[in-house]
Amino acid sequence: MRDYPKLTAEEAAQLISNGQTVAFSGFTPAGAPKAIPSAIAARSKQEQAQGRELRIGVITGASTGRSLDGALASAGAILFRTPYQNDPELRKSINEGRTNFFDMHLSMLPQAVRYGFLGPVHWAVIEACDVTPDGEITLTSSVGAAPTFCHKAEKILIELNAFHPRSLMGFHDIFEPEDPPHRKPLMLCRVSDRIGTTSIKVDPRKIGGIVATNAPDEVGGFSEISPTTQQIGDNVANFLAGEIKRGLLPGAFLPVQSGVGDTANAVLKAMGDCKEIPPFDMHTEVIQDAVIALMKAGKVRFAGGCSLTVSNPTLKDVYANIEFFRPKLVLRPQEISNSPELVRRLGIISINTAIEVDICGNVNSTHIMGRQLMSGIGGSGDFARNAFLSIFTCPSLAKGGKISPIVPQVAHLDSSEHSVQVIITDQGVADLRGKSPMQRANAIIEHCAHPDYRGLLRDYLALAGHSHSPQTLRNAYAMHLAFADSGDMRAAKFTK
């Protein structure tokens, strides 16, 4: 039994040394520490003012909140960052070359830490709603890679956040796979199965201190559903309903994985409104507002995920009705929620968002014009490659019509044509299964591209001539170059 040191955030920040690697809990802003990283950022600014440096390596489960990524990036306190981010200040620092960023599939992050591929982890900073004297840590609204961080870090600091009730105990299913060789299978055959424990057990001597906090997750709200996202959602729902009618999906449906954001929320709402789609389960990364609404409506029966990334009003609703949600929700580590083994076994319908798609079905999820990072690949690759059905969505126009997300060739490749089965935009659906590259190109141009760009893309296809893959190196990036030169892809000129 042990009494842990009670620290202020500033005292905790004093324990961190320049050049150390700090692993933070959180998967999205859900469950991410707030007080300690903000204090580290403030201390870094103080050190810089005195001619000294305090910069750290930052590892997380995924993106975090403004008090972590935002504060540290603004202070210039991040040496390197992995595996995913979504903060404007950090994105700017990465794209300006001031912060080294390593993008990776989220399912692989915990094992990369355990294998030592990312070097030693000096500190783990973990948000918890409870910690016992014998070292049992109950997490808050996400799991992410926190179990691995706790076990591999030399020392642990805990933010004990009173905003999250201790009644969260029991919502988590903590399990770490064995490392190779002879790793055993994950014994999870249904979305609702449990294979682990409800808390993280650590040696209490590793816990260097506890900082008491009371702060909500820094999850922003979602935009209202637009006509474009509504149409994308309707197209997804109608396509899936059609798959049931054709006998290509079971009548009882299959578990769903959905990305996060405005389009994902619109897709889930449309699926909930579609009478031809029966109540379904979800095995996903991020459980967001739309999932909770569908659960209350009886459309989602059970949701397993890595984080409860919902707006604060929705989170308060969940906590106020926690016994209603207890048998319907489970939070898992990201190497379980995103495990390719489980994605294939459960037969997941995977629905993710693309930045751009080319006419062969290759997807760019991460970069603008091939150069500027947006966020990272996240879990889309984990799910897309192994799903029963792999769907990518995007609008048919961007930047007021000056950009076509449907292009001859993506400027950056994240998910190749071998992992992508269906493309859906507000214009329609391109089913790529069983199609040759030329057949895929025709389907994507005719069903997914905006009418303003179909003629241009048809011209490109004609120039490709007779070949297995309809590409011409001379013109593959003509639309991107036209935007770079004139600010409008419609100005593209192809050369013979």
Report the location of each language-model feature:
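Conserved alpha/beta enzyme-core scaffold
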Residues: 1-496
